[in-house]
């Protein structure tokens, strides 16, 4: 495992005088937002027997994050390209693998399973496609699977590996709304040290402690916790801001 150059940890994780605010936001999210169902819907099936394929339950789960897979894409994912998707998921790191334990090449190399899956789901025509010893290229026209939607579907299948490239989160991280560079940025952030409860620790350990305190219905990964906290603290929507204002702590 190699480590990226140092990156700036978001301010909410550097506020030693108010370090519980991030924990409180995470806990409040699971009380007030339907997004908690993205993680809990069919949780055990998703990470065990169905970890190597995309199911109709996965497509329903992403709707809990305010997106919908277009009908033409549903058919492609569940039928037309299902075998290719299964082969790519089978070649990718498993559902329990955290992003900080994989090498950068597994996240950036165009012929690695995760990159191939991203390009296939996005319909990035001409991108290399390698699976089961076969090598071809992605073909076909775009069918509504944008970067945010694809990131949510891939995060559902690999919650410890793929961050959700929501515009609020990518903007907060100084990245383009397309999410380009998000995987490497998230990996680097997880390895950065922060101070929490008087101790220095990697951000992923600090987020694990936040998850323990939040007591979600099902366990979530540190990467998912990072997505939630950054989304909640930076979301400008009035309804979200109103809920955020009721969370103990200051911002």
Regions from the language model: what does each represent?
Residues 151-156:
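Internal, hydrophobic cores of structured domains that mediate oligomerization or house catalytic pockets
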Residues 1-141, 160-251:
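An N-terminal alpha-helical hairpin/helix-loop-helix interaction module that forms a charged
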């Amino acid at each position: 495992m190699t480590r990226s150059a140092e990156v700036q940890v978001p301010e909410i994780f550097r506020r030693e005088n108010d370090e519980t605010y991030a924990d409180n936001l995470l806990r409040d999210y699971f009380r007030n937002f339907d997004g908690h169902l993205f993680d809990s819907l069919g949780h055990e099936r998703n990470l065990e027997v169905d970890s190597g394929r995309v199911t109709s339950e996965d497509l329903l789960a992403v709707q809990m994050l305010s997106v919908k897979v277009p009908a033409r894409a549903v058919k492609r994912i569940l039928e037309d390209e299902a075998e290719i998707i299964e082969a790519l998921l089978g070649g990718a790191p498993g559902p329990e693998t955290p992003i900080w334990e994989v090498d950068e090449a597994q996240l950036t190399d165009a012929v690695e399973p995760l990159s191939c899956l991203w390009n296939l789901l996005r319909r990035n025509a001409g991108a290399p496609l390698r699976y089961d010893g076969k090598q071809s290229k992605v073909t076909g026209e775009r069918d509504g699977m944008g970067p945010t939607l694809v990131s949510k579907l891939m995060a559902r299948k690999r919650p410890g590996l793929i961050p959700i490239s929501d515009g609020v989160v990518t903007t907060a991280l100084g990245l383009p709304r397309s999410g380009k560079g998000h995987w490497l940025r998230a990996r680097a952030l997880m390895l950065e040290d922060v101070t929490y409860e008087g101790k220095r620790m990697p951000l992923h350990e600090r987020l694990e402690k936040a998850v323990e305190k939040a007591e979600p219905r099902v366990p979530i990964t540190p990467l998912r916790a990072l997505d939630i906290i950054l989304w909640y603290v930076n979301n400008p929507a009035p309804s979200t801001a109103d809920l955020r204002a009721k969370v103990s702590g200051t911002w």
